[in-house]
C-alpha cells in the first residue's frame, strides 16, 4: 500500500516517533492504522465530516451482525492510536494526527464483551437468535490464547504471513531500548500485553508463489531452498520486501547488490 509512504515523516514533524512510541508502544510499520488514517484524510478530506465512525474489520463484521458499534481493545492497540499505559485512546496521538473526534465515538471495550444479540434481519436469515461476544479480535491475540504455555517465562512464535515472536507481560515496555530494538506492545486478553517483534513470515514466499503462478508448491520451494548452494543471503526484514511491484525482481536485485 503506497498511500502511507512518507506519512510517518509528516507525523514526526508534529509528534516525534520517540514520543509516539512512549505512549502507544507500537513499532513503526508503514501499515499502522494511524498512518493509514492520515493518508486516507489526505486523499479524501470529505471523510473528516462525512464519516460517522471508524471500525476495523472484525468490529465491522460484528456491527453487521448486531447493528451495534464497538472498538475492541486488543485490535485497536495494534494501530498506534492507543495509550498502552492507560488502556484508552491517546488524545495526544489523535490530536497530532488531526483525526476527528467523531471517528472514536463507539466505546472501547475489552475482549469478552457481549456486544448484543443478532439483529432481527440477521436472525431471520440464519433461522436462530444468538448473542455476539467480541473475542480478542486481533488474530494474534486469539492465537495466543490457544498456546498451552502459561508460565511467565514462556515465549511464543505465531507464524503466518508474518511471524510474531515474544512473550506475555502484565505491563507494556515503552522504553527507548525497546523502541530501538523494534519491539511492539499489543494489548492482550485480561489486560495483558504481548511484547513481541514482528518479523518476516511467509509473505515473501506467498508473493513469489503467486508470481510464478503456483509452478512450485510451497513444499517444493522449501526443498529447493534447503538444497541450494547459492552463497548469498538477503535481509528479509528489509522494508524493500514489504510491498514491491515484483517480489522476484526485488529479491534478484538484493542478491545482485550482495
Predicted region positions:
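Nucleotide/phosphate-binding loop and acidic/charged catalytic motifs
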Residues: 1, 71-76
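Short alpha-helix plus adjacent loop in nuclease-associated cores
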Residues: 1-14
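Active-site core segments that coordinate phosphate-bearing ligands/cofactors
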Residues: 12-25, 35-70, 81-96, 120-258
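Conserved short loop/turn motifs at secondary-structure junctions
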Residues: 25-28, 76-83, 109-113
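Short glycine-rich phosphate-binding loop at a beta-alpha junction
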Residues: 29, 52-54, 107-108
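A conserved helix-loop-beta module that forms one wall/lid of the active-site cleft
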Residues: 91-113
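Glycine-rich phosphate-binding loops at beta-strand->alpha-helix junctions
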Residues: 110-118, 163
